[in-house]
Amino acid sequence: MISPGASRVSTPISACSGCRRRGPAMFRKILIANRGEIACRIARTCQRLGVAVSTVHSTADADALHVKVIGESIGIGGAPASESYLRIDAVIAAAKTTGAEAIHPGFGFLAENTDFARAVEAAGLVFIGPTPDTIERLGDKASAKREAVAAGVPTVPGSEAPSEDRLEVEGIVRRLALPVMLKAAAGGGGKGMRAISTYDGLADEIESAMREARNAFGDAGLIVEKLILQGRHIEVQIAGDGDGNVIHLFERECTLQRRHQKLIEEAPAANLAPGLRQRILDDAVRLGRRLRYRGVGTVEFIVAGTDYYFLEVNPRLQVEHPVTEMVTGIDIVEAMLRIAAGEGLPVKQDEVFCQGHAIEARICAEDPNDSFMPSTGELAHVRFPSSGIRVETGVESRSIVTPYYDSMLAKLIAHAASRDQALDQLDRALGETSIFGVITNRDFLRRLLALPATRAATFHTRLIDERIDALVTVTGAIDPEPLAVGAYFWMMRQRATASSNPWQSGSLTGWQMAAADDGLSPIPILHLETAGDSAEIRFAPLQPDGSMLIGVDDVKIQVRLSPLADDMFAATVNARCETVRIVQQDQAIFVHDPRRAQTMTAIPYLRYISTAAEISGELRAPMTGVVLKINVTVGSRVKAGDPTVVMESMKMELRIASEVDGVVTAVHFKPGETVERNAVVAVVEPDLIPQ
């Protein structure tokens, strides 16, 4: 039985062709060769159609939500994707073990792997997707570009074939002239992509892109294209029966991106001239017909003014497919199943309509205030809106976010009559979403939605880069109010557990507190640490009405909390009333109010140990990951800013740079080894230790 909690849909998605159940040609059972939210989402459609489902998991995902939701899962290897989700033999063996007739690849991993599609068919199973020949022609971006040219679709100038030779790629870059884009030939999703605007460090950028492409897709080949600045990313959802019949399900706007990864997607595209829209839709369908496309796919374009250029075809289900489902009412996963089962296209072109506007936001485990560094750990608390929004997720409270896979935790999808209404609906839903235990981009997304350019749909693909200062929180700009609320919560917990007067509790200070002139304790009782700052907390005695004056450094704030239900409280902060959610896990306190989410660590003052004397030459891992490359050896001389170690986490490369000039005195890890967050990777002895 598939749990409805895996993915909630408040606005129903109608089934193709009138919600038909499993037809005579439909599969009895399939295997989903994926994980996380997409595995849960595919399983939901299968349940509705009466199709049984099995799946696979790595050792890191043994207790993952998709395993619980689907109920039947086969372990296929270790935590790294190369040892599990990318193992073709293990996936096919799992399908046979569970009695599946077909395999749905989802997106990522093996979804665009020609060898996998061929192996599935060779094993007597059905691959739910395009033919292996189509994947081969489109999975390689250079080959896809040749197909587009043959179909009469305009393309971006660039290399004609992929290359794994760094020197050859470097030569192409110099011939095209800057700026250019390096792209992994074998896949998308922002992996193996680099925007190049300077020749400085070009060799390192090429090598890094190749490593990332190899790790993500098993192929290090790159292509080079001219980079079109300030363009819009428009893509068309197509579906074909394999016999030359191809339709479109209208377009999506995917312009709001960071590091070439989409964050906000919507359908239809706003402010797109009708004539331009029709030409783009027609070109996408014409290319699909030339390919005799089977299944669903996405034709991507870059739009600059009234001109547009073909980028690539993704021969698979897209992360952002829900926005198309919401405006067309067509279940795209069901369409994939019916086409693969030989039932043909579920609808005709003149039966496809676009109603209203849908917008999707991707919530990721990453810290926008720290260069979007991925965040890993246990999710202490997860809660999404209970109604009025579509939620696709693969996590729940107590889920573990590991460094081995993509950082996306959930997608929220709003659907309304107008774009403005959908934007407002999505913003409210993000505000009601609580994810504690890792740092997320939730507040960043809300600020992005509020930008005038976003509201007016006058954006381009570099908007986030250009407005990054307005989208991230300035380090050191501590907000005292959520800290005061967290401090009040902590004190009340102390009172409840100490069963004595907190001013005499040995767990706090060890001596009788005397009142200070300002009514607060004469010394700080609590030290609160946040991601980028810290504060000293002093308390005044609890008042008869339950309120308390709390000092956050030099700021005094009056706070009162009244329990509502579970982790919800009515908070009065300096006479302003609002509903907040507060969760505590060990010493971590998570406060979520209508405007922001704040994580803090509570350290009673006498246990507080200053970190000011830490050796600045210690190079620590910013998060759990795998060492890819060591650039130094013991005795190497480095300067501040020199990259010493290259790590990979969540399929993205991280470079650890020396903070000082000096000499390397220790290197504690080797390439291929896993490093825990905050572990000392190497040590640099500074040339001069500050006095």
Positions of the model-derived regions?
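Catalytic P-loop NTP-binding/switch module of NTPases
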Residues: C577, V583, Q587-P622
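Conserved nucleotide-binding/hydrolysis modules and their immediate coupling elements
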Residues: L542-S547, G551-M568, T572-E578
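Structured functional modules or segments
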Residues: I609-Q691
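Short acidic-glycine loop/turn motifs at beta-strand connectors
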Residues: T198, G240-N245, V303-T306, P385, ...
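Short amphipathic, helix-prone segments within low-complexity/disordered or flexible regions
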Residues: P4-A15, A25
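Catalytic cores of soluble metabolic enzymes centered on carboxylation/carboxyl-transfer
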Residues: A284, P322-G551, V555, P643, ...
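N-terminal beta-alpha lobe that positions the nucleotide/phosphoryl donor
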Residues: R22-V299, V303-H321
